[in-house]
Amino acid sequence: MKKAPVTQTPVKDFFFRGLICGGFGPVVMGIIYFILHFTVEEFSLSGMAVFTAVISTYLLAFVHAGASVFYQIESWSLGKSVLFHFSLLYVAYVLCYVLNDWLPFDLLSLGIFTAVFAGGYALILLVISVSIRMTVRRLNKQLR
């Protein structure tokens, strides 16, 4: 199956996607903080904590949206695309979570996070792969 062509250079496409979707990170963070305000007794944040969360979640959403460009670089194998996509997302999530003190910076916490992240990533990749295979089979049957 041929990959969709990149509309621009991969770098431009990465930044374009990031700019389009980056704002969703702070919106999600705001919704979570709003819910915490009503569910956690005496929930409060410093101005610096809010600033750090807004900037880091924007950058996380930016990177997350842009990283999908790795799957559209036609000269790359699927394995290389997965490796770069996974690695970039992993580093972005770890940095965001550690900077916001949402994840302690110790070996045990990072190990657990890594296992959960890798397992979740593998599960999502499996679901997408099965979905694509089922769609291809259905389309091939329709062509016969």
Where are these regions (language model features)?
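Juxtamembrane "helix-exit" motif on the non-cytosolic side of transmembrane helices
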Residues: 34-42, 98-104
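Alpha-helical transmembrane segments of multipass membrane proteins
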Residues: 30, 34, 66, 70, ...
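C-terminal halves and exits of single transmembrane alpha-helices
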Residues: 85-110
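N-terminal signal-anchor transmembrane alpha-helix
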Residues: 1-40
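Membrane-helix boundary/interface segments in integral membrane proteins
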Residues: 36-79
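Non-cytosolic membrane-interface motifs at loop->transmembrane helix junctions
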Residues: 44-50, 80-81, 106-116
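Membrane-water interface at the C-terminal end of transmembrane alpha helices
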Residues: 118-138
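Short, charged juxtamembrane terminal tails flanking transmembrane helices
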Residues: 1-4, 137-144
